[in-house]
Amino acid sequence: MAFVPPQAGYDRAITVFSPDGRLFQVNYAREAVKRGATAVGVKWKEGVVLAVEKRITSKLIEPSSYEKIFQIDDHIAAAPSGIIADARVLVDRARLEAQVYRLTYGEPVPLTVLVKKICDLKQAHTQYGGVRPFGAALLMAGVNDKPELYETDPSGAYFEWRAVAIGSGRNTAMAIFEDHYSDDLDMEGAIKLAILALAKTLEEPSPESIEVAYITMKDKRWKKMDKEEVAKYLGEILEEIKEEEVEEKEEDYSELDSNY
């Protein structure tokens, strides 16, 4: 008889807790997010910006067909990490809920309402048989009375942030936010910070590998930046990074000289 590891039953069953109180399938769904493309969001007083890594694996892929920031409604967008097919199902559901709310109440859906509905769906997929957890996290951002930015977890939990990252580069990006985020950021500063955090997670950052969109309280409509705009910001950021590296090397050499 083949040996069956003690945790095997908990691995297979979505609705059964392990003795130490974990749902293994939810943990595995989170692992899918940790291996996914990095997505970041930054909020400032008058708006929100999202920036996402585009992993184009072949030069034959049409870049325009590889969408990574999804518009839910005029005033709400989402950026996923993890299994994109799972994220697409969540995005389609969010779009449907936004349309139903608008038709029912005659006004745009509040982001908090939409986030809760999507997370209720995610949570249900951790509780019932015949389904599995969604292997995707979403950053959901938008404006109603104020700018808002949420992270949704595969478990169905959600959190509001000033600046946040998901995906494989989360730790690096969050460290950048901890060092550089300020409540006094303007639009220019927020966009630069988002692109900086994302660029730091990439081996070879380029305008083709970064997608950026933002919304302001004034317009209340999402706008995607074109490749030329991204290239402008990225060029400035990479130049600043080079200058910082040169200054650090100069400081290192100064310390060496002082030891002689």
Swiss-Prot record:
Matching SMART domains: Proteasome_A_N (SM00948)
Single GO term (MF): threonine-type endopeptidase activity
Cytoplasm keyword on record: yes
Gene Ontology biological process terms in this record: proteasomal protein catabolic process; ubiquitin-dependent protein catabolic process
Annotated keywords: Cytoplasm, Proteasome
Alphabetized Gene3D superfamilies for the sequence: Glutamine Phosphoribosylpyrophosphate, subunit 1, domain 1 (3.60.20.10)
A GO cellular component entry from the record: cytoplasm
CDD domains: proteasome_alpha_archeal (cd03756)
General function of this protein: Component of the proteasome core, a large protease complex with broad specificity involved in protein degradation.
Complex and partners: The 20S proteasome core is composed of 14 alpha and 14 beta subunits that assemble into four stacked heptameric rings, resulting in a barrel-shaped structure. The two inner rings, each composed of seven catalytic beta subunits, are sandwiched by two outer rings, each composed of seven alpha subunits. The catalytic chamber with the active sites is on the inside of the barrel. Has a gated structure, the ends of the cylinder being occluded by the N-termini of the alpha-subunits. Is capped at one or both ends by the proteasome regulatory ATPase, PAN.
Name by which UniProt lists this protein: Proteasome subunit alpha
Protein species of origin: Thermococcus onnurineus (strain NA1)
Gene that encodes it: psmA
